[in-house]
Amino acid sequence: MVLAAPLLLGFLLLALELRPRGEAAEGPAAAAAAAAAAAGVGGERSSRPAPSAPPEPDGCPVCVWRQHSRELRLESIKSQILSKLRLKEAPNISREVVKQLLPKAPPLQQILDLHDFQGDALQPEDFLEEDEYHATTETVISMAQETDPAVQTDGSPLCCHFHFSPKVMFTKVLKAQLWVYLRPVPRPATVYLQILRLKPLTGEGTAGGGGGGRRHIRIRSLKIELHSRSGHWQSIDFKQVLHSWFRQPQSNWGIEINAFDPSGTDLAVTSLGPGAEGLHPFMELRVLENTKRSRRNLGLDCDEHSSESRCCRYPLTVDFEAFGWDWIIAPKRYKANYCSGQCEYMFMQKYPHTHLVQQANPRGSAGPCCTPTKMSPINMLYFNDKQQIIYGKIPGMVVDRCGCS
């Protein structure tokens, strides 16, 4: 019996060692409590901290990279402008100094009118390239035509409506003159010429043009001294009216022209019928046509809310006032754009040999990068470091197209 007791104790210890490791010493009740704690229900939670979950990736990694590209582009623009203007640093000219210097400068409005400054104007979706083949329109002559019946009362006035093609309406008008032929007078006389803008008659309109139906809006009035017994061609500046017509083509219903002498005789030749050949009123325009033609943009264009991950062109407006660069007179801001996105093999690659090199040695060559493949200049009017006003053209400041290279 003495030998049997140690032997029995050994068997009991061996049985304890052979039990499953996950089973607690207290039996099934303890195992159930441990399972409940692991599931997070019932009982007291374990004081041991749970292992932290790995951080989730950013919700929009493309957006983070895009913001990084924007910041790099802005810094690059700053350095490029200073470098291309041969300035070591931005001129120290405050807004107050600019206000003091501008009135003493030569008239700047002529420069601002003659040269295009890219500002808040919207840029076309398709990029533009220089067109060296098509002719540039310089002078446009528009002959008077019959007015629309909607502006006539008892068939009057028949003259004058001027039609302009969309091509002309998108040019820069440098000068606009309305030419009217005045009949000869037997003796020197003072003639009062007036130009009235026409508009359709309303429901309350009457033949007298009173009330809500009035169709005459005086836009020009001239006093002319005639001394010749022969006819006289009179020119009238019409640039301002033309600008309003081009901005709102639906407002161009035509004009009525009158030139009365002291006796009340209308000397203006406005008849479009026989006997007035070559004497009809006409409009002469001096325009500066944009010598660029639209071409299909082969690159992708995206906005800031796009989920596109491929190489794409994004809008970016550079605000010089936000930089504190008051030394730039014009433009105060411009649309620079920037490129961002991934470049997979054979996606929008600029050069075919790039793909061949990467295929031949994929490990030894860097992948293609999303970069500008077409850029255009901007015009700039600015103060240099000597407080002189300079006009210049800065190349390569607007991204027109992006691609992989």
UniProtKB/Swiss-Prot annotation:
The record marks G119, D120, R296 as: Cleavage. Residues 1-20 form the signal peptide. One of its GO terms (molecular function) is cytokine activity. Pfam families: TGF_beta, TGFb_propeptide. It is found in: Secreted. Disulfide bonds join C302-C312, C311-C370, C339-C402, C343-C404. Coiled coil: none annotated. GO terms for biological process: activin receptor signaling pathway; amacrine cell differentiation; animal organ morphogenesis; anterior/posterior pattern specification; camera-type eye morphogenesis; cell population proliferation; metanephros development; negative regulation of amacrine cell differentiation. Disruption phenotype: Deficient mice die neonatally showing altered patterning of the axial skeleton and impaired renal, palate, stomach, spleen and pancreatic development. One of its GO terms (cellular component) is protein-containing complex. Its main location: secreted. Keywords: Cleavage on pair of basic residues, Cytokine, Disulfide bond, Glycoprotein, Growth factor, Secreted, Signal. Synthesized as large precursor molecule that undergoes proteolytic cleavage by furin-like proteases. This produces an inactive form consisting of the mature C-terminal portion non-covalently bound to its cleaved N-terminal propeptide. Activation of the mature form requires additional cleavage of the propeptide by a tolloid-like metalloproteinase. The keyword Glycoprotein applies. Residues 21-296 form a propeptide. Belongs to the TGF-beta family. PANTHER family: GROWTH_DIFFERENTIATION FACTOR 11, TGF-BETA FAMILY. Homodimer; disulfide-linked. Interacts directly with ACVR2B. Interacts directly with ACVR2A. Interacts with ACVR1B, TGFBR1 and ACVR1C in an ACVR2B-dependent manner. Interacts with FST isoform 2/FS288. This is Growth/differentiation factor 11. It comes from Mus musculus.
